[in-house]
């Protein structure tokens, strides 16, 4: 059966597939070497996590020179990032044990429970205000959590379940598009109240992608997409500081913009320019010396470009390209096996990781206006690392179940 399906899957049978559980007679499946998960996907993910950890350390090593961070050691962010990665890997190990059927059954409840977090951040003494935005819930012990990162994952699994349930009426405006638009409006209102337009942009993109991949009516999908894009344009037009960002992006080198709205962009471009092909060397960045704000989060790629050059940036871009392509391959395999929910989830994860990486890379290279989105799996930030790794774990689970089914087993 596996050999007959290989032409449709567009990939060669790999060694890991050969080591999957094999059914002997009527006995239960046995494992030959326990290579049950996509080893390449695991290693590429670990590579990005390790790469990000090293660059976060490099970007923050001089922070303690500033009076604002004088009470912290040079290893403060490195230790916190290492702890976040360890917690994310532990959570991923738990998530990868959950069957996709169970995840689908609980997807709606997970989604609506996650919306409670978006409400909590708006409440006094619960939500933490940073630079005029309330995006974090504060827990005892100084731990912060960003609910919008959780909503990215729960919205994805909910949208996939929604499209599976609506397959018979997926062409209907009243039964498919309007309910999804209503849900998106609720999420949008809560996120824009923080405000967090970047997270809303990612969630809207994920939802639209799943509607499209799920076979929604083409004309209605186009109208829905135009409405969403129009809403974002309207928000920019009605917001003076968002308009300033657009104008600054168009002309970042004017004196007023370079010292104002385009300050981060201009310094990110300077960092990229200094790096040239091979960079100035690990640890040799000048822009991280309190010139480039958020060098360890939104603009980590600029520091990579400065210290490791175009080659270092190219490694990051290729790794994300590989993950996105692998996610779509896994989704296509699931679809061939008549597992539509798993297919939509896998490809939705590809859209999420790839889309957010594309926006972050575009901002760092000056190809897109400045937007507060981190680089998945690499930038400093415990909530984002946790949910990115959990998303990869779900992707591994989909692939694992695909392999079991292709070998004649049951999940």
UniProtKB/Swiss-Prot annotation:
Pathway: Cell wall biogenesis; peptidoglycan biosynthesis. The chain crosses the membrane at residues 41-61, 82-102, 110-130, 137-157, 173-193, 197-217, 220-240, 299-319, 348-368, 375-395. Its EC number is 2.4.99.28. It is found in: Cell inner membrane. Belongs to the SEDS family. FtsW subfamily. PANTHER family: CELL CYCLE PROTEIN, PEPTIDOGLYCAN GLYCOSYLTRANSFERASE FTSW-RELATED. This is Probable peptidoglycan glycosyltransferase FtsW. It comes from Thiomonas intermedia (strain K12) (Thiobacillus intermedius).
